[in-house]
């Protein structure tokens, strides 16, 4: 009887010591700061005839 009582007591103590993992959402929202600088350049190459047309007819663009 004492052995059974000791076994039950020790098993209850061991069950109480098992690790528990808890996953919970954070209280504050997650913020991601991205400092991105985007630069682009458009290069247009035109023939001389097209350049003259663009100079004379500036209303095209």
From Swiss-Prot:
Traits of the deletion mutant: The deletion mutant does not show any growth or outer membrane permeability defects.
Membrane topology: Lipid-anchor
This protein's UniProt keywords: Cell outer membrane, Lipoprotein, Membrane, Palmitate, Signal
Localization (cell): Cell outer membrane
Residue ranges of coiled coil: none
Pfam families: Lipoprotein_19
PROSITE patterns associated with the record: PROKAR_LIPOPROTEIN
Lipid anchor positions (N-palmitoyl cysteine): 17
Cysteine disulfide partners in this protein: none
Signal peptide: 1-16
Main subcellular localisation: membrane
Lipidation, S-diacylglycerol cysteine type: 17
Function noted in UniProt: Involved in outer membrane lipid homeostasis. Interacts with the inner membrane protein YdbH to form a functional protein bridge connecting the inner and outer membranes of the cell. Is required for YdbH's function and may facilitate phospholipid transport through the periplasm.
Quaternary structure and interacting proteins, as annotated: Forms multimers. Interacts with the C-terminal region of the probable phospholipid transport protein YdbH.
Family designation: Belongs to the lipoprotein YnbE family.
The protein's name: Outer membrane lipoprotein YnbE
């Amino acid at each position: 009887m004492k052995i059974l009582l000791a076994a039950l007591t020790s098993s209850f103590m061991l069950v109480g010591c098992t690790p528990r993992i808890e996953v919970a959402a954070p209280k504050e929202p997650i913020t991601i700061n991205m400092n991105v600088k985007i630069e682009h350049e458009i290069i247009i190459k035109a023939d001389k005839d097209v350049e003259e047309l663009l100079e004379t007819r500036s209303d095209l663009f």
